[in-house]
Amino acid sequence: MWRTLSAPEQDLVAARIDSQDPFNKYGTHAGEICESELPFYPGARLLRVTNRTPAVGSRYFIQRGDDLVPLHRLPEVQSFCDDRFGLVLDSRTAADYFRFAHYFSREGESTSLVEAPHDLRIDSSSSPERRQAIAFIEPLEITRDKDGVTVTACTFDEPRSRLYRDCYRLTPGQPLELLSREDSGVNLDSSFHDRLLQIGRPDLPVPHHIAASTE
């Protein structure tokens, strides 16, 4: 979950960011800085730095101690961070690890995770087509084995207004891989998704299928 930093905390983070990158001054121009714990990278926190100019968008950093990594400069965020921060992958961290990996992947550039109908602001009183979308949307399904996790997740492609059910393979130290995609056949041309990365979903139950291989 995101927490907005207090003014003194924000000043410290902004100064640290700008000391590392004085040219862009993301800290100086920050409108709001929020933090979220990353349970799969023990002791690390994710920082979301929102620029005062909306067109600039947000920048993300991971901080642990004196180590501050600007994620927008990395070609492969998740695989780099696995090596840099030391991954802990278990039933407690698997869902958030996948959310993080998907958001910063090539797939995450074109699709957003949809874990419940309210992620797209769809309610049960909607049109028949939207009720069809509600029936299609399912929570994450995670199967964990000794080499990583396989995840089934619903995603939304906003430019195409399409809702999918995707299957991914996530192996520590390697980029997220899309294995298969099922199209819902539903056109959601007026749906809204804010594309915010959500670490921790207290509004949702724990993903209903987490199975560790005994092999």
Residue ranges and their predicted role:
Residues 56-57, 135, 160-166:
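Short, surface-exposed coil-to-beta transition loops
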Residues 171-181:
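Short beta-strand edge/turn micro-motifs at domain boundaries
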Residues 158, 180-193:
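Short, solvent-exposed aromatic-acidic interface loops
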Residues 44-46, 146-150, 173:
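A generic structural signal for beta-strand entry/edge sites
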Residues 191-215:
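Compositionally biased, intrinsically disordered linkers/stalks adjacent to structured regions
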Residues 140, 166-169:
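Hydrophobic/aromatic beta-strand elements that line small-molecule binding cavities or substrate pockets
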Residues 117-156:
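Extended beta-strand-rich segments in extracellular/periplasmic secretory proteins, especially
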Residues 1-133:
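Extended, low-hydrophobicity segments enriched in charged/polar residues
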